[in-house]
């Protein structure tokens, strides 16, 4: 009962009818965080696209200026010098045929958060689509995870590069940091992600592109964001409205 009272108290602080400016939303999210551990801060978008149509798929990557607060575990499919370069860059798991067979059997799937592969191995890695695809982990040239420069890819992912892809319900969601981050760090991470989502707007998408946006912490209430705010994100009031 104590836990539910805490959650209700946090929920009561959020105005469900209001669209919050990013800075205001971040402050409120941190205030209403109910976990004893350092919770994550996540953003979710509902986009005005039909992901069933190839020309309306929204998929990309963004380098968050302050990272996510979590160091991603990276698996790399590579051989020879490329495998050595991946290991030197800090890859957590590196291998080729034997590792591909392990993953195909569904083993070790909880040991990594991102996958990189060299182009020459994609013929073999391709058969992992039914295992890695649903988890959003399939290497893709468009996101820089199919590359000969595996060291660079590993370094970027470890440094806070995140990959996003709209789901079948037209939603996008990803972590922008931890509750322990400063307000400015969280807003700047949000701004970097928002800029990239706007840049990737499909020309075939009609009507309003970002229909809804919300920010929340682990076990915290959802806070609706004013998705029209794309500039002056570190200002609590919208200068255009003053």
UniProtKB/Swiss-Prot annotation:
One GO BP annotation of this record: translation
InterPro entries, alphabetized: Ribosom_uL1_bac-type, Ribosomal_uL1, Ribosomal_uL1-like, Ribosomal_uL1/biogenesis, Ribosomal_uL1_3-a/b-sand, Ribosomal_uL1_CS
Database matches in Gene3D superfamilies: 3.30.190.20, 3.40.50.790
CDD domains registered for this protein in UniProt: Ribosomal_L1
GO cellular component: large ribosomal subunit
Gene Ontology terms, MF aspect: rRNA binding; structural constituent of ribosome; tRNA binding
Assigned keywords, A-Z: Repressor, Ribonucleoprotein, Ribosomal protein, RNA-binding, rRNA-binding, Translation regulation, tRNA-binding
Family recorded in the similarity comment: Belongs to the universal ribosomal protein uL1 family.
Quaternary structure and interacting proteins, as annotated: Part of the 50S ribosomal subunit.
HAMAP family registered for this protein in UniProt: Ribosomal_uL1_B (MF_01318_B)
Entry function: Binds directly to 23S rRNA. The L1 stalk is quite mobile in the ribosome, and is involved in E site tRNA release.
Protein name: Large ribosomal subunit protein uL1
Lineage: Bacteria, Bacillati, Actinomycetota, Actinomycetes, Kitasatosporales
């Amino acid at each position: 009962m104590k836990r539910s009272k805490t959650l209700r108290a946090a929920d009561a602080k959020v105005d469900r009818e209001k669209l919050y400016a990013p800075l205001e939303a971040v402050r409120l999210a941190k205030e209403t965080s109910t976990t004893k551990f350092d919770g994550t801060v996540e953003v979710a978008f509902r986009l005005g696209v039909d992901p069933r149509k190839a020309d309306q798929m929204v998929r990309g990557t963004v380098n968050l200026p302050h990272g996510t607060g979590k160091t991603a575990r990276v698996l790399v499919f590579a051989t020879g010098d490329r495998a050595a370069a991946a290991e030197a860059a800090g890859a957590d798991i590196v291998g080729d045929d034997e590792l591909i067979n392990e993953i195909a059997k569904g083993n070790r799937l909880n040991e990594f958060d991102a996958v990189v592969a060299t182009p020459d191995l994609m013929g073999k890695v391709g058969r992992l689509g039914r295992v890695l695809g649903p988890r959003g982990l399939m290497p893709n040239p468009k996101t820089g995870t199919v590359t000969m420069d595996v060291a660079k890819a590993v370094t970027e992912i470890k440094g806070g590069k995140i990959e996003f892809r709209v789901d079948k319900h037209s939603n996008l969601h990803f972590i922008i940091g931890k509750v322990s981050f400063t307000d400015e760090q969280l807003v700047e991470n949000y701004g970097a992600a928002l800029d990239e989502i706007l840049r990737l707007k499909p020309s075939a998408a009609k009507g309003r592109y970002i229909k809804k946006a919300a920010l929340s912490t682990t076990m915290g209430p959802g806070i609706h964001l004013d998705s029209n705010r794309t500039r002056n994100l570190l200002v609590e009031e919208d200068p255009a409205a003053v």
